[in-house]
């Protein structure tokens, strides 16, 4: 097993490079920016159709009234994501350009959204245009519009293909003329693509993409497809790469499109049978976090005999219940631990197989509404599928199956830890032996040991108000450390204020902070982040797995870690 893990780890640099790809990141951040729209629209969808499960149907007029906010938000999500994706990609491009010669992100957003309309919205006979492909069906077209637009702007800006105005002209007026050429070139190129596709295939770009990729989408929804897609989530995470950063952008168009398709099927009184959805990923495959670890903290707490495992279980139960499972992943540890390789990969795959069986064979509706990712898995299953009776059975069955899968491996690992404790090894020594090969914890150990040996944390070096931003992939894990810092700062009177955020959504607020801390799941973005913080004179620190979990549990140590970053 160690040999297999070692072989997998050889590909880690390659996959980390993929996870930092600016185009994949633009897709991910574009969806994050549009998430309020997605979640808001789902509220009306649930109100409109959940009562159907209990035999109550709204009158047609009320149903149409409830669906109006959904149709005018989720129904144009492709149009909106064209803009948010362009904005995110523009931010990444600007970090490669001189500070005095930047791309105007507002202009790229407008050009991308206009270009998207050209490629996705056919003219209506009565005037105006049709909106059939402005929603999730147009997401891939939205990405194309954003990528082409921003690259056209980059070429124009780098080569000064602009209209230069006299210095006497106000900057805001000059910017308008500066953007004319790249805006025009972008629209012309996207329109030319639309004309070519229309001439060859007879339909617009968005419809042609949907037609061409329909067989791929269908294959992805099969057992082999879901095994590869969702098995990759866990495999990447196991070797220390944030799997969703690689997999989610690749399947985002499918997942959100399938949710809308399922909603339309429910609306038509038919069976919602599309399995690959955002709900499947959040509440089935990653129930309790990547690796389907919802049951693991409870098993550590109730079934393990070792003191260390019991303590880790107690500390991990609450965050894991809400999908934040880094405490158990790095605290046990599970990642890079040969004992847990099989269940960590197997449990998510078995979960999605069972879910597909319930949908395809037993006739349960799949997910037709988007919910916040922090919704506890069992609750998300019930809500996202419209309170179907089978959803309660499914949630209970998945918990049982995951317990059976993890049980023998938890017992084996507990025996290992018991043996270590019997030999007189401390918990920190045992943990270090498990993660030292892949997670550098020496600095953390020194900080934590120093913090434990003193009555008070050494916060005297920080005499002025210091704002700390902790970043992770989704904003959940970063909250653990931010809360620990704020509590310790209040207890010991340290002038430190911490906030949690998600990587990619930080750029508008970055200049408000004096220190940025990267959680382990986004530590691979250190070099990119350093380019941003160096420009603003902000300190930057990255953390490793066990180190990060240790800091979230030790406020004194966390304050000491912050102080350490300001020492010359």
From Swiss-Prot:
Q: How does it sit in the membrane?
A: Multi-pass membrane protein
Q: Per the record, what are the reactions this protein catalyses?
A: lactose(out) + N(pros)-phospho-L-histidyl-[protein] = lactose 6-phosphate(in) + L-histidyl-[protein]
| Post-translational modification Phosphocysteine, affected residues | 472
- Cite the entry's keywords alphabetically: Cell membrane, Kinase, Membrane, Phosphoprotein, Phosphotransferase system, Sugar transport, Transferase, Transmembrane, Transmembrane helix, Transport
Give TM segment ranges. 30-50, 65-85, 103-123, 128-148, 183-203, 222-242, 246-266, 283-303, 339-359, 381-401
PTS EIIC type-3 domain span: 8-409
Which EC class heads this enzyme's classification?
transferase
Boundaries of each PTS EIIB type-3 domain copy? 465-568
Its domain of life?
Bacteria
- Domain comment in the entry: The EIIC type-3 domain forms the PTS system translocation channel and contains the specific substrate-binding site. The PTS EIIB type-3 domain is phosphorylated by phospho-EIIA on a cysteinyl residue. Then, it transfers the phosphoryl group to the sugar substrate concomitantly with the sugar uptake processed by the PTS EIIC type-3 domain.
- Annotated protein name in UniProt: PTS system lactose-specific EIICB component
